[in-house]
Structures are given as structure tokens and as C-alpha cells.
């Protein structure tokens, strides 16, 4: 782990004020182009607790983000996460749903995703 930078501390403080949630860590994901992706998963690691919440901030290229319910896996919800967007995954998100950032068929530039979490 690395210490919080001034910029990340500012973002974290704004998020906590806006959401009334507490975050102890941030994970960076870099998607370099349309070929970079992150397949279907839930952020349900033991250290995040039983029903974790995650705040996701997108920077750079707009990318499609997909959700599907565990009991209805053939029905997908597509969202376009644009530069500066905030997506909150709160109570039930990780226990009832999976999500992914799929590969794109269109050329894409860099996208950075910051996922703020609370490690217990």
C-alpha cells in the first residue's frame, strides 16, 4: 500500500461527504485500449466484508459497463461510464449482481477507473 496523495485525499473526502460512506483504500485500473477488459465478477473479497459498497470514478475514455443479476444471467444492463462519472455499488450490489467492463469493437483510448472501497 502507498500513502494517500493530496489529490486522492481530496477526491476521497468529496466522495465521503457526497455519499456519507467511509473509504479506506482505492484501487486503480488502467484500460489502455478497446482490448483491455475485466470479465464478469463481483467484488466480494473477504476483506471487504459481507455486503461491501464501492464508489467507482471513471477518467478518460467512455466505456460500456454491464451488470447482470445472479438469478437472471441472460438479462444484461448496459451503462456508458463517461469521463468524470461516479457509479455507486451499494448494499446488495456484490451479493446479487455481477459486473464487467467488456472489450469494445470500436477503437478506444486510455481509461482509468478508481474504485474506492472500505477494507475491514
Predicted segment positions?
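Non-heme Fe(II) oxygenase metal-center motifs and adjacent flexible, charged/small-residue loops
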Residues: 1-120
Amino acid at each position: 500500500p502507498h500513502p494517500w496523495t493530496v489529490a486522492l485525499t481530496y477526491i476521497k473526502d468529496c466522495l465521503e461527504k457526497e455519499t456519507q460512506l467511509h473509504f479506506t483504500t482505492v484501487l486503480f485500473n488502467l484500460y489502455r485500449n478497446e482490448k483491455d477488459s475485466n470479465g464478469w465478477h463481483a467484488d466480494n473479497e473477504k476483506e471487504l466484508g459481507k455486503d461491501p459498497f464501492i464508489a467507482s470514478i471513471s477518467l478518460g475514455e467512455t466505456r460500456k459497463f454491464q451488470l447482470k443479476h445472479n438469478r437472471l444471467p441472460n438479462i444484461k444492463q448496459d451503462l456508458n461510464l463517461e469521463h468524470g462519472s461516479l457509479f455507486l455499488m451499494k448494499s446488495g450490489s456484490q451479493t446479487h449482481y455481477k459486473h464487467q467492463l467488456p472489450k469494445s469493437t470500436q477503437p478506444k483510448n486510455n481509461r482509468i477507473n478508481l474504485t474506492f472501497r472500505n477494507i475491514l
